[in-house]
């Protein structure tokens, strides 16, 4: 008898394969960065195109022109509406206090139903002063920014997404000063991200609903003679007689897609402003002929990210500086782009 070879179908690393709790992705781990800056940004996926550029990464094609698929993520400025301070608790970080800005856009009420009432400029300054005292006393161990998106600037929708971003650096006082300067103001992507650096992309994937084990796990379709008795796109059996239960490792039908995923080390090729990219000294519109399918025209700032990005068009995409970059990494500078495809994607 020949050797039986049946590799494991699909990965158990992502189990249970269920729908994400929220379409807004969460970031649990932040990279260590000596620069005092907001560690990441957020935008909306527009679509894909391709470019030609001179390869500056270490390898066989260095110095040669290469073809690179890229994803365009529109990133209107984020608004800093608050500061969140953390203290050291028994089991980890605990929220010590928050300070919210007193003048917020009316659209924020669509997302946050519990905005404080009778909260004016004097109250804001008083709470900010109390937080500064806590920082000076050494009770605060970390300071982070509370931001919300502004999708109405790109005519996408009115309800914003709210999220939290860490601040780089080691000094808590420097972090607080950074947050104090920016609360109540907008932050653009070019202020916190650098062209050419590696990013981690966090998003929720496209939802595909309920799918069978063949598409969901990659199991083989039954032999054609075995299909005569009934069906072929199913597993041969659910497991042994004992233990008398179905193991969780058995590939079965169920939810596929709309999963929370992180993709590491995507290079930020370029950052554009107001829908335009500087190419060979000239400004060009990044929007292809006829617009991006199911999205439209790029009106604000955008990121050009190498490769694909999880999620559907118009979905919120979050990025952060790479948390585990490779040893051989490209220089943190914009590569020389020779061509950008703006042909119709229809």
Curated annotation (Swiss-Prot):
GO molecular function: rRNA binding; structural constituent of ribosome
Keyword set, alphabetical order: Ribonucleoprotein, Ribosomal protein, RNA-binding, rRNA-binding
Entry superkingdom: Archaea
GO biological-process terms attached to the record: translation
Statement: the UniProt record of this protein carries the keyword RNA-binding: yes
PROSITE patterns: RIBOSOMAL_L3 (PS00474)
InterPro entries: L3_arc_euk, Ribosomal_L3_dom_3_arc_sf, Ribosomal_uL3, Ribosomal_uL3_arc, Ribosomal_uL3_CS, Transl_B-barrel_sf
Region (Disordered): 324-346
One term under GO cellular component: cytosolic large ribosomal subunit
HAMAP family in the cross-refs: Ribosomal_uL3_A (MF_01325_A)
Functional note: One of the primary rRNA binding proteins, it binds directly near the 3'-end of the 23S rRNA, where it nucleates assembly of the 50S subunit.
Subunit field text: Part of the 50S ribosomal subunit. Forms a cluster with proteins L14 and L24e.
Family label: Belongs to the universal ribosomal protein uL3 family.
Protein name, UniProt field: Large ribosomal subunit protein uL3
Originating gene: rpl3
